[in-house]
């Protein structure tokens, strides 16, 4: 059963990631149809899943469904628990060399693999549709848009669906993971924000002050209720990346939703906010990787 998103108060408007993602996917399907009509190859996405972790299986299923919806061919590699790093490295080499594959997705975490970064770095950066390869993150740091990390790019798309400006705003990011927090800071810097990043070494009083000052607040830690909604600046845009399952089965974010919704101008629900945008952006990256492969582009300037 699909969890339902909370309803916002009369103060905040919901940034409905499900609806916006569906609109993005509809547009991507048109792009794939146009490619095929022009005699170009169907975009191909290799999806690698190791083990049977229930959460990872759900995420992979959602990605495969999105690929089918837009007309991307998904090549499924469901590998058993205990698959070694050497076996995965060999598979990545095969996928790098396969012209039918335009994007490679390695579902994280990888059970039994202590350092997944070595495998991520083995992926051809031109096929790194998650946007995790150091070369792609480096291009983002240099403001050379190529294959960008999916969640931050999806959040930028969400921000574009509000009536609030982004340029010139104070943005606070809570959480500095390699896949969300750090590249999110780069995205917001490029967009013209003054960015504050908070992390486990940020003193509590500084964290609170930074949140209270934020016109745009992005929280990506994975701790339910970490940010009290009362801290949210009136009129802010709140992007809650966290998704946490409580003992009673409810899914909640990192921000106290009810109180935050009384103060914010816009807020993402959990679930139904950032997650669908991450999946849709993965499809966007895959199509752009296919376009770049057709044109001989090294991967720069495609997004």
UniProtKB/Swiss-Prot annotation:
Keywords: Amino-acid biosynthesis, Histidine biosynthesis, Hydrolase, Methionine biosynthesis, Multifunctional enzyme, NADP, One-carbon metabolism, Oxidoreductase, Purine biosynthesis. Belongs to the tetrahydrofolate dehydrogenase/cyclohydrolase family. The lineage of its organism: Bacteria, Pseudomonadati, Pseudomonadota, Gammaproteobacteria, Lysobacterales. The gene is folD. Catalyzes the oxidation of 5,10-methylenetetrahydrofolate to 5,10-methenyltetrahydrofolate and then the hydrolysis of 5,10-methenyltetrahydrofolate to 10-formyltetrahydrofolate. NCBIfam families: PRK10792.1 (NF008058). One of its GO terms (molecular function) is methylenetetrahydrofolate dehydrogenase (NADP+) activity. It comes from the Bacteria. Its EC number is 1.5.1.5, 3.5.4.9. This is Bifunctional protein FolD.
């Amino acid at each position: 059963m699909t969890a339902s998103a909370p309803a916002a108060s009369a103060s905040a408007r919901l940034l409905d990631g499900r609806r916006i993602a569906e609109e993005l996917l509809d547009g991507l399907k048109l792009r794939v149809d146009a490619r095929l009509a022009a005699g170009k190859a169907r975009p191909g996405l290799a999806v690698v899943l190791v083990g049977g972790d229930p959460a990872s299986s759900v995420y992979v299923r959602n990605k495969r469904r999105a690929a089918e919806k837009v007309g991307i061919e998904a090549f499924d590699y469901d590998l058993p628990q205990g698959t070694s790093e050497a076996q995965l490295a060999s598979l990545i080499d095969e996928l790098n060399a396969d012209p039918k594959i335009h994007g490679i997705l390695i579902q994280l975490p990888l059970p039994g693999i202590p350092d997944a970064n070595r495998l991520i770095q083995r992926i051809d950066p031109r096929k790194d549709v998650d946007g995790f390869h150091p070369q792609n993150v480096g291009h983002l740091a240099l403001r050379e848009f190529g294959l960008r990390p999916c969640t931050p790019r999806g959040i930028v798309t969400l921000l574009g669906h509000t009536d609030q400006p982004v340029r010139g705003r104070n943005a606070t990011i809570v959480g500095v993971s390699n896949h969300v927090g750090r590249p999110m800071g780069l995205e917001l810097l490029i967009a013209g924000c003054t960015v504050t990043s908070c992390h486990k070494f940020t003193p509590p009083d500084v964290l609170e002050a930074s949140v209270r000052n934020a016109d745009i607040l992005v929280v990506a830690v994975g701790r339910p209720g970490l940010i009290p909604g009362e801290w949210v600046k009136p009129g802010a845009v709140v992007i809650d990346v966290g998704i946490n399952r409580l003992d009673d089965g409810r899914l909640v974010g990192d921000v106290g939703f009810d109180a935050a919704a009384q103060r914010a101008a816009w807020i993402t629900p959990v679930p139904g906010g950032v997650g669908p945008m991450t999946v849709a952006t993965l499809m966007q990256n895959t199509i752009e990787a296919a376009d770049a492969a057709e044109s001989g582009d090294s991967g720069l300037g495609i997004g």
